[in-house]
Amino acid sequence: MNDHARHSQHPLADAPVRLTPREQQVLLWCAYGKSSWEIGQILACKESTVNFHVSNILRKFDVPTRVAAVIKAIRYGMLAEQ
């Protein structure tokens, strides 16, 4: 198997960004267009906690917005249709 095929079979292993499980949840809800308040209601946490996770996600992806983080996550194969 060539390197390209191996990499495309395991995109998460090759993704340059490592998110915590909670950051992954927050990112998924961001992809669905939810606000920090809405995500807080869904995950049973405070809006400020969601904003903390969003800040970490933006820093890890080195992007300025949630939309840019979602786009990068899709490119890296980190978000799939549920």
Task: Please tell me what each predicted stretch does.
Residues S35-A68:
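Recognition helix of helix-turn-helix DNA-binding domains
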Residues E23, V54, V67-V70, R75:
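Alpha-helical structural signal
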Residues M1-R22, L28-W29, W37-A44, G77-Q82:
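Linker/hinge segments immediately adjacent to helix-turn-helix/homeobox DNA-binding domains
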Residues W29-A31, S48, I74:
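Short amphipathic helical patch at the helix-1/turn junction of helix-turn-helix
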Residues H7-H10, N56, K72:
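Intrinsic structural disorder/low-complexity segments
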Residues L27-A31, L58, V70:
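Hydrophobic residues on short alpha-helical segments
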